[in-house]
Amino acid sequence: MGNSKSGALSKEILEELQLNTKFTEEELSSWYQSFLKECPSGRITRQEFQTIYSKFFPEADPKAYAQHVFRSFDANSDGTLDFKEYVIALHMTSAGKTNQKLEWAFSLYDVDGNGTISKNEVLEIVTAIFKMISPEDTKHLPEDENTPEKRAEKIWGFFGKKDDDKLTEKEFIEGTLANKEILRLIQFEPQKVKEKLKEKKL
């Protein structure tokens, strides 16, 4: 997307990222230098993205979730993210405005990219999320959502869908905005990602 490899971030991309995220010019410029050091080509691969995510969760297995996050931001499906896509991915998974976040969450759950979500797709993402929850934390989850299957069932039940029904983006966003319980169940906001962003160690 037109990222310069000379070591300076283009003014257009800088302005766009400042507009779409809460990051400052200094933060973005600093991350860009680090990004180029790690990825001299100016692009990050699925494997590299997975490795970065793994650093946040040394005691868990974030590979599956990281792959889904990567897929949802790889807009042109070329198997890489440029700096802009990478920063937006980190922003959306750690902060993000609710509506933007829900649009992203829909694309995360729409595993096959066909514009609707099935119950099986919900289970696939929830299973990936559970791999990042420590066994200790899992013990503290309510009885009706302490396994991926139970949580997927609970989410699907909130939307009032039959097992073989599909969920559109409009239904997903409206349903989630109307019910904070769904919002809590569908998202996973890694606190460690937020902490790393604050430390500017990405």
Curated annotation (Swiss-Prot):
Ligand binding (Ca(2+) 1): 74, 76, 78, 80, 85
GO biological process, one term: regulation of signal transduction
Effect on the protein upon substituting residue 193 to G: Reduces interaction with GRK1
Compartments it resides in: Photoreceptor inner segment; Cell projection, Cilium, Photoreceptor outer segment; Photoreceptor outer segment membrane; Perikaryon
Effect of residue 39 to D: Reduces binding affinity for calcium at both EF-hand 2 and EF-hand 3 domains. Abolishes interaction with GRK1
An annotated GO cellular component: perikaryon
Record keywords, A-Z: Calcium, Cell projection, Disulfide bond, Lipoprotein, Membrane, Metal-binding, Myristate, Oxidation, Redox-active center, Repeat, Sensory transduction, Vision
InterPro entries: EF-hand-dom_pair, EF_Hand_1_Ca_BS, EF_hand_dom, Recoverin
One Pfam family it belongs to: EF-hand_8
Stretches assigned to the EF-hand domain: 24-59, 61-96, 97-132, 147-182
Membrane topology: Lipid-anchor
PANTHER family: CALCIUM BINDING PROTEINS, RECOVERIN
Subunit description: Homodimer; disulfide-linked. Homodimerization is caused by prolonged intense illumination. May form a complex composed of RHO, GRK1 and RCVRN in a Ca(2+)-dependent manner; RCVRN prevents the interaction between GRK1 and RHO. Interacts (via C-terminus) with GRK1 (via N-terminus); the interaction is Ca(2+)-dependent.
Name of the molecule in the record: Recoverin
Source organism per UniProt: Bos taurus (Bovine)
